[in-house]
């Protein structure tokens, strides 16, 4: 499922590039997921497993000790796009891809698979989150985008527009965390069992 080696990856504005299928990003061992953007925003692996399934993925088994994090990138005040692919795999089905240091998530939350929270429910909680599929284990590819200066946010799932031009967000991601959040309950909250293939951050809005 990895995509970095292909011809269609946009490089303009790319500030973080993590791809489990590319040996330049993960050579097959160790606890570092290497940022291929050249900006040094490597992620640290905490008790997660690499698999060759779907070309290369990381398996997060769920629980507070099993997660992936980066604490060097901050797009909270920048225009942004988060491009990622992930899926829930079990009943521990809360957060997967999100911001480490702020309340930001793209994709999975509380059993739902099409959620986008950027310090506000983009598209609205009822229209965006509750209207989507719950308890799905299907892979999905997400684009969560935000233009901070114009207060406009877009959300695409498998290239399908979920929300366009919404005004409910307020920040991009501060850091990266996959598998839980560090914001509440003594840094141990909303863990998820799932798989992730790639995560890319851009410091601009990508258009469909």
Locations of regions flagged by a protein language model:
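Short hydrophobic/aromatic patches on beta-strands that form ligand-binding or substrate-lining surfaces
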Residues: 16-20, 35, 80-90, 142-144, ...
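Extended recognition patches within non-cytosolic domains
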Residues: 1-14, 23-29, 195-208
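Short, tryptophan-glycine- and acidic/Ser/Thr-enriched carbohydrate-recognition patches
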Residues: 20-48, 208
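Short, solvent-exposed loop/turn segments at secondary-structure junctions
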Residues: 22-25, 89-91, 183
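Extracellular glycan-interaction patches encoded by glycine-rich segments
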Residues: 1-2, 123, 172-201
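Residues that flank catalytic or metal-binding motifs in active/ligand-binding sites
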Residues: 14, 54, 80, 138, ...
């Amino acid at each position: 499922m990895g995509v970095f080696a292909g011809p269609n990856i946009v490089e303009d504005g790319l500030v973080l590039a993590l791809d489990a299928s590319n040996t330049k990003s993960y050579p097959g061992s160790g606890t570092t997921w290497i940022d291929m953007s050249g900006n040094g925003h490597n992620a640290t692996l905490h008790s997660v497993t690499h698999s060759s399934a779907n070309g290369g993925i990381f398996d997060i088994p769920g629980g507070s000790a099993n997660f992936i994090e980066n604490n060097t990138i901050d797009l909270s005040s920048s225009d942004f796009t988060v491009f990622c692919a992930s899926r829930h795999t079990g009943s521990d089905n809360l957060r997967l891809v999100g911001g480490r240091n702020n309340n930001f998530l793209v994709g999975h939350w509380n059993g739902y698979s099409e959620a986008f929270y950027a310090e506000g429910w983009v598209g609205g909680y009822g229209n965006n989150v509750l209207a989507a599929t719950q308890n799905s284990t299907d892979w999905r590819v997400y684009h969560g985008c935000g233009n901070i200066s114009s207060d406009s946010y877009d959300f695409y799932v498998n290239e399908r527009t979920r929300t366009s031009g919404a005004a409910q967000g307020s920040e991009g991601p501060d850091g990266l965390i996959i598998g839980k959040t560090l914001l509440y309950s003594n840094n141990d909250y909303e863990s998820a069992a799932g798989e992730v293939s790639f995560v890319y951050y851009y410091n601009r809005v990508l258009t469909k």
